């Protein structure tokens, strides 16, 4: 679950990290009032969306008077911001962050993520601040400094000092960096965070370190332990179908094709998309209904898939390991009747009672195509959707 920048900075402030004074505004007038509270003659206004690249898209601006603040808010509030990280529709802007202006002498990068390879939280830092860390990793990987956090003892000050020295920090900056490092580590653990990025972490003209940006993502699996962070959830930033799927514990990701895919198991779902592509088709989604594929969940999955107007055919690929294929077949039939599916549906069943499941589908009287194998299913659904792309 992603947080907005202003929410991330609220967390940073709770843990004693240096952030700019700023306020989120929902109206142009509130944005002007926020500038009055902050004071000064220059401010930075930022569109609050769950996407990077806001600056290049015009969603971040340095303003020098209240009229500019009002004009910026009027331009963006209620509109969608399109960046290189969003789709063509962009993300809706419902809040503007107004904060004090910060002088920048140098930009650094500091972040932390759960590294699956080492099975530990890994801190990363670089002198290449303000740049996507993926770009740095690809082009100049030697510029990324890392520190693995031992889960037994937690983050240690010496790890922060080692990185600070390598970043070229001196004197009081080393102490400040250590405080920021330890604060982020504490925040990461206590709030069940999956990703933190401070990009950029800046050295101001006076030599002090300052967190100029905040990207925070919480581990959604731990949301039940973090009720305060759950309150920060902004569903408007998510695909409506993905949000609906999450309510039914369905793993759904929208794609650009015209063949809807409903599968039980993430690995099988990816394999299904691959074989559809192999035979010239284009998947419209990734959808994993999981092990408990009940009639109700299958029906909801159909509704979500069919809410995409591009879908011309649906491929249901079920391996009956935990569940029986005949029960799944009955669920599919019930779902097709309930939802009123009018496009071709191809079903491939394998595993426990697979033959019985295919018989149930064949005798249903519905226009459901029972495939004999995964290859056959892929070929049939591609044909039903209009042929190879």
UniProtKB/Swiss-Prot annotation:
This is Succinate--CoA ligase [ADP-forming] subunit beta. Succinyl-CoA synthetase functions in the citric acid cycle (TCA), coupling the hydrolysis of succinyl-CoA to the synthesis of either ATP or GTP and thus represents the only step of substrate-level phosphorylation in the TCA. The beta subunit provides nucleotide specificity of the enzyme and binds the substrate succinate, while the binding sites for coenzyme A and phosphate are found in the alpha subunit. Substrate binds at residues 264, 321-323. Keywords: ATP-binding, Ligase, Magnesium, Metal-binding, Nucleotide-binding, Tricarboxylic acid cycle. It catalyses: succinate + ATP + CoA = succinyl-CoA + ADP + phosphate; GTP + succinate + CoA = succinyl-CoA + GDP + phosphate. Its cofactor is Mg(2+). One of its GO terms (molecular function) is magnesium ion binding. Pathway: Carbohydrate metabolism; tricarboxylic acid cycle; succinate from succinyl-CoA (ligase route): step 1/1. It is an enzyme of class 6 (ligase). One of its GO terms (cellular component) is succinate-CoA ligase complex. The keyword ATP-binding applies. One of its GO terms (biological process) is tricarboxylic acid cycle. The lineage of its organism: Bacteria, Pseudomonadati, Pseudomonadota, Gammaproteobacteria, Alteromonadales. PROSITE patterns: ATP_GRASP, SUCCINYL_COA_LIG_3. Its EC number is 6.2.1.5. Belongs to the succinate/malate CoA ligase beta subunit family. Binds 1 Mg(2+) ion per subunit.
